[in-house]
Amino acid sequence: MTIAEEFKSRNFSIYGQWTGVLCILLCFALGIANIFSKVIAFSIVCLASSFVIIFVEVPLLLRICPTSSTFDSFIRRFTTNYMRALMYVILSVVQWLSLIVGPSSLLAAAVVLSVSAIFYALAGITKQEFMGSKTLGGQGVAQMIV
C-alpha cells in the first residue's frame, strides 16, 4: 500500500501515525530550541517525548535498535488507538502547561500533539482497527527483520 492509498483509506490511526511523525520532528526541534529559556523543564520533557514517540510510531526501530526488555514492554503498551490517544493527551497537556511559565514555541508542539491525540481518539471511537503505515515499518515489515 502506497502512502497515497493509506491516506485514502480514511483510517484515523494512519492520520494519527503520520501526525505523530510530525510530532517527533517538532518536539525534537522545539525541545532543543527552548533548552536555554525559562521553560527549560518543559523543553527537556518535549525533547524526551520525541524519543518515546519515535519508538511508538516507527515499530521497525524496536527491532534494529538495542533496547532493554523493560523499555520494549513499555513501548508495546501503546498498540491500541485508545492507549496512543492517552499518551498523546498526556504529552500535550504537559506542553500546554508550559504556557503557565510564559509563551514559547512549545505551543506548536502542544497543538500538534493534541491533533494526533484527536486522530487516535477518533479511530477508537469509530471502532477502526489500528493500522500502522507500511512506510514506517508497520504491517509485517518489522516482523520480516530477524
UniProtKB/Swiss-Prot annotation:
GO biological process assignments: vesicle-mediated transport
Predominant cellular place of this UniProt entry's protein: Golgi
Protein origin, superkingdom: Eukaryota
Localization per record: Golgi apparatus membrane
Signal sequence region: none
Ranges that cross the membrane: 13-35, 39-61, 82-101, 106-125
Gene Ontology cellular component terms for the protein in this record: Golgi membrane
Keywords, comma-separated and alphabetical: Glycoprotein, Golgi apparatus, Membrane, Transmembrane, Transmembrane helix
Glycosylation sites per record: 11
Annotated disulfide bonds: none
Keyword ATP-binding annotated: no
Pfam families in the record: Cg6151-P
Membrane topology qualifier: Multi-pass membrane protein
Similarity annotation: Belongs to the TVP18 family.
Biological role: Golgi membrane protein involved in vesicular trafficking.
UniProt name for this protein: Golgi apparatus membrane protein TVP18
UniProt source species: Ajellomyces capsulatus (strain NAm1 / WU24)
